[in-house]
Amino acid sequence: MYSLIEDIKKLLSVMLPILVAQISTAGITFINTTMAGHAGSDDLAGVSVGAGLFYPLLASIVGLLMAGTPLMATLLGEKKPEGLPYVVRAGLLIGLVIFFLFGAAYVLFIDDLLTSLTLEAEVAYVARYYLMTMVGVVFFISMIVPLRCLTDTAGSTSTSMKLFLMAPPVNAVFNYLFIYGHFGLPRLGGIGAGLATMLTYGFLLALFLIVVLKSSALKGHEIFHSILVKRSDVKEYLIVGVPSGLSIFMEMSLFSLIIVFLARYGTDTLAAYQIADNFASLVYMLPVSCSMALTILIATAVGAHDIPLARRYKKAGFVVALSGAAMTAAMTVLFRSSIGNMYTSDAIVASIAGQFLIYSAGWQLFDAISTPIQGILRGLKDTRVSFVLMVIAYWGGCFPMSLFLDHVVGLGADSYWLGLVFGVGCSAMLMILRLVYVERVMDREALPAFAFFMHRKITHPAAVHAVVASNVKQAKELLAFWERAEEKLASLVQDIKEAEVDIFTENRRVLPIGLSLLTDLHLCILGHATRAYIP
């Protein structure tokens, strides 16, 4: 007889190493932007622009490739480890395709993209070659993620943690060499930060290859002994991964768009939003790590056809996520003034940020429900409907509500935080409904998605058609909304342009943080980077 405490301990043993790895990755981003800032304002601006364009795409790529986790965990639960090499090779193949597509997009569109941003020549130069180094980063990360999925499932999440803990100091050394040009190397400034990132992930890939090849449990030699890839594995990888990647991209795009609408309220409000966003994103690592751990545990349990065990892990996940959110939300509210003062010495900005942090506390509580459920559903390979629900919650709920509160009710900048809380709340509600539906149908042994992936056949075609028809109807309603909102949106964008607020020029505010200087946009980039599912 297992107790809830034992299930929580098992969950934490998987979750905490993932959390440490997430923090290590955020450390790479922080080191890059901080050291680039000391190289000069043009270098920092170029890195900020390049990172702002790149990280939403990278997060989506990682979200897609992390689909290997439930696929491999399910195989292990089914006691079919011989299938692991095929899934890993499928992930590596998809990663290679993504790399070539990203490289081609860079060559074809980089000139037009930078021209459309109307950047200063020095900033555009740094951004161009920073993004060139990111092509290499895409290759290395696309190779790392499938291997990480393997080590997390067939090995231990502590393996990834140990490897990622090596990354920040290695990255700092490379930054020191290439940004500032020490030991006879050329001084590359912000471009050096990109080169350092690429070399750091290359170093990580080498470490992962060594670990995988040395472990018989990870079947490293079997993975690279053949290049055979099963079409069914590639198809399943994409079916599970594409909705996850798109969900991340849609979410991050919304946060980026909100910055544009907040720009008309002035630099103080924009800076305060980005402080609150950055802090909330750091806190968000907790439910994300819980979600990733739940994916591994539940996929393994489902693969073993142990549904009661999967339900126990679900319960443990909610206890951990909600307990953590209650603590972080309480600390956010109680210490909001201190948090704002940690980011900036500007009293006005800190005061506005304190108000925004109150809203972020509500956001944290809803996230503690929504994010773990996403991990549970991912463990069941149920991602397509979850993606539709995410789009409805954020783009059909959060964004329209923000515009309504701002332009109809007149709540000003607070409208966008209230809209975010509303959107995350809608996401939590929809995810609960989806999970309840999934569990009920599993009880009847007729879950369409579950039956399709676990048994390779559809037991109830009528149920599948009903779900598809419902999703199509919701998508049509969402498109209709966008058509109605198009004129209003164009008008708002024009108002912002007329206000002459440009977050990409040197007129942006610079916030002193400790011994470093972070710009408004810098803080935003850090927030987006830590929110991402980057390995």
Each model region followed by its residue ranges:
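Interfacial/gating helices of multi-pass transporter permease domains
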Residues: A36-Y55, V87, E122-V126, G190-I191, ...
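Transmembrane helical elements of multi-pass membrane transporters/channels
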Residues: S13-T29, T133, A167, T200-L204, ...
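Short alpha-helical transmembrane segments in multi-pass integral membrane proteins
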Residues: M1-I18, M72-F139, L185-V242, I298-W363, ...
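N-terminal transmembrane alpha-helices
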Residues: E6-T34, H38-A39, G52-L71, L96-G103, ...
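Small-residue-rich hydrophobic transmembrane alpha-helices
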Residues: L44-A104, I141-S160, I259, L270-R336, ...
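Helix-terminus/linker motif at the lipid-water interface of multi-pass membrane proteins
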Residues: I23, G27-A45, L114-A121, L177-L188, ...
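Short runs within selected transmembrane alpha-helices of multi-pass transporters and secretion channels
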Residues: L65, M134-D152, S160-N171, A193-F208, ...
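A detector of single, family-specific signature residues
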Residues: P448-P535
